[in-house]
């Protein structure tokens, strides 16, 4: 594929990601909602520094996109990304998300 086509594909994927952040986080939360309770248990025990318990919204707002990889195979380009949390509600892990060429989102597991 020519360089302009590659750039267009990258721009398209990043634009989609910016427009669909909530969709990606929704899929992540389906498999990882328990982190909110785990962090709140740690806050209560004093093993996680926070001023007060967190809500699901606090957790969702802490998630940031990191390490985007785009695989270009003609029309069938796919991409993966890692979700990190600031503060570190994922306890040193990153949530790997996979997005196929039809923009179907799957949780690929935790890294780290």
Tell where the protein language model's regions lie, with residue ranges.
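Mature extracytoplasmic or otherwise solvent-exposed domains
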Residues: 1-22, 26, 75-80, 84-86, ...
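Long, charge-rich alpha-helical interaction segments
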Residues: 3-59
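Acidic, proline/glycine-rich low-complexity IDRs
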Residues: 57-63, 67-112
């Amino acid at each position: 594929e020519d360089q302009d086509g590659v750039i267009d594909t990258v721009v398209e994927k990043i634009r989609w990601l910016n427009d669909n952040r909530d969709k990606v986080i929704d899929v992540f939360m389906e498999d990882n909602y328990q982190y909110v309770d785990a962090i709140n248990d740690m806050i209560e025990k004093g093993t996680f520094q926070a001023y007060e318990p967190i809500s699901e919204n606090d957790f969702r707002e802490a998630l940031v996109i990191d390490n985007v990889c785009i695989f270009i195979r003609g029309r069938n380009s796919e991409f993966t990304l890692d979700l990190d949390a600031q503060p570190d509600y994922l306890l040193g892990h990153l949530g790997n998300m996979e997005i196929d060429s039809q923009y179907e989102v799957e949780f690929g597991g935790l890294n780290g």
